[in-house]
Amino acid sequence: IMMLGDKSIKPEEKLTRVYPQKNLFSHIIGQIDDDNNGIAGLEKSLDEQLKKNKDKIQLTVDKDIQFLIREELIKYNQIFRSNGSAAILMDVNNGEIISLVSIPDFDPNLRTNITDKNYINRVTKGVYEFGSVFKTFTLAAAFHEDIIEPQTQFNNLEKKLKCGKNTISEYDEKIPSDLSAEQILIRSGNIGSVRIGQSL
């Protein structure tokens, strides 16, 4: 077009981001606006560094693990017909994030076709009831206070327990009535967790 010599046509340089992995790291990488300013994810938190520094930025995420976890989430999203799901995998020895996946995700190369719900990072911005995840904190507090040890035994645990105005029951009737603290955590025992919580 420029070879036509039409003076009304002027070239304009514009930087464009290209994301070869498409959806795979979308919520980690985040987004930019029309002027290439970071507005979410690493694009936002490392905005200045990305603009000034031409060197590569090394992340701790593993591409293969990220792929496998994403595939599993997509599969079970379809099986359970859920609105979305999320997973995070961290190395507990050093805090490095090995994988962070939020479904639905998006292809940052095709931002014009993305709905708002796809932009939500369910790992960092999702709001959830604690549910059984909180059992970890209950047991950790009891260990910290030297109230229990992993092998502390809890016998004759009921299948239902009245807690204030609420009745708490086991999600699985097959959970034994005699469990160690370790087994309560492994089997996600509701009654045993309440008993430990009451001892704090």
Per-range role (PLM):
Residues I1-D55, L59:
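Small/polar-residue-rich segments within soluble enzyme cores
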Residues K7, L24, E96, E149-P150:
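Short coil/turn connectors at secondary-structure junctions
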Residues K14, M90, I98-V101:
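Basic, glycine-enriched DNA-binding surface that flanks or lies within the catalytic cores of DNA
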Residues K22, I98-S102, L110, Q151:
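Short, solvent-exposed loop/turn and secondary-structure capping segments
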Residues G30-D35, S99-D105:
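Short beta->alpha transition motifs characteristic of CBS
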Residues D33, G41-K44, S102, F134, ...:
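Short, flexible micro-motifs
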Residues I39, I98, F106-P108, R195:
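Generic domain-boundary/flexible-linker signal
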Residues N53-N93, P108-L200:
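Active-site loop and adjoining helix of the penicillin-binding protein/serine DD-peptidase-beta-lactamase fold
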